[in-house]
Amino acid sequence: TDYTYERHVAWMNEWLNKNDFTGMTFVGQDWGGLIGLRLVTANVDRFDRIVVANTGLPLANREPSAAFRAWQKFSQEVPVFDVGKMMSGGSKTELAPEVIAAYNAPFPDETYKSAARIFPTLYPDGVDHPSNIANTKAWEVLHAWNKPLLTAFTDGDPITQGGHKTFQLEVPGAKGQAHTLISG
C-alpha cells in the first residue's frame, strides 16, 4: 500500500523541497511530530528551531504507552468511528455540539474515515519496521541539535505523557529553554 508512515514523510519532504523554504520554525503536534521531525532532521539547514507538543519520534527500543496501544486497538475494532465524539472525549472539557459537528464534517459516512481509522496502525514500532532505521538516524541528528528546541506538552494526555522529558534530556538545544507543561 502507498498509505504508510514512510510515504507520508516522503510526500511532505517532496513538498518542502519544492517550496524551498528556509529559516523555519517547526511546530509539531501528534502525528505532525512523527512526520515533521523526520523532515527537520533530513533538512537541518532549512530549520532554525523546533517546538514539539504532545508528540514523539518512535524508536524500536521505546515501547509506546498502554493508552496508545488501546487507541490502536480501538481504532480498528469500533464499529462507528465517530471523530467528533473521540475529540470531545479526549478534551479536558466536553466540546460544544457545533464543535463536534465541525470535527465530523469531513466524514459524511464511514467510507470517508478509512485514512483516519488506519493511521494509528502506521505507528513505526518494532525492530523490523521499515522506519526504524530512519527514525534512529533522525534521533542521531536530534542528539546533535544545538538550535533551540522547546517542548509544550500537557500532563493530561495518557498517550504522550512524559514525552517532553525525552526531548529535554536528549536534545542539546532543549537546554535552558522555557519549556511549558500544561495542566490538564
Which stretches of residues belong to each language-model region?
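Conserved hydrolase catalytic core segment
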Residues: 19-63
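Helix-rich cap/lid subdomain of alpha/beta-hydrolase
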Residues: 59-119, 123, 127-131
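Generic structural signal for small/hydrophobic residues in well-ordered secondary structure
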Residues: 12, 16, 29-30, 103, ...
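Active-site loop/oxyanion-hole signature of alpha/beta-hydrolase fold enzymes
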Residues: 1-28
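Short beta-strand segments
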Residues: 25-29, 51-54, 118-120, 150-155, ...
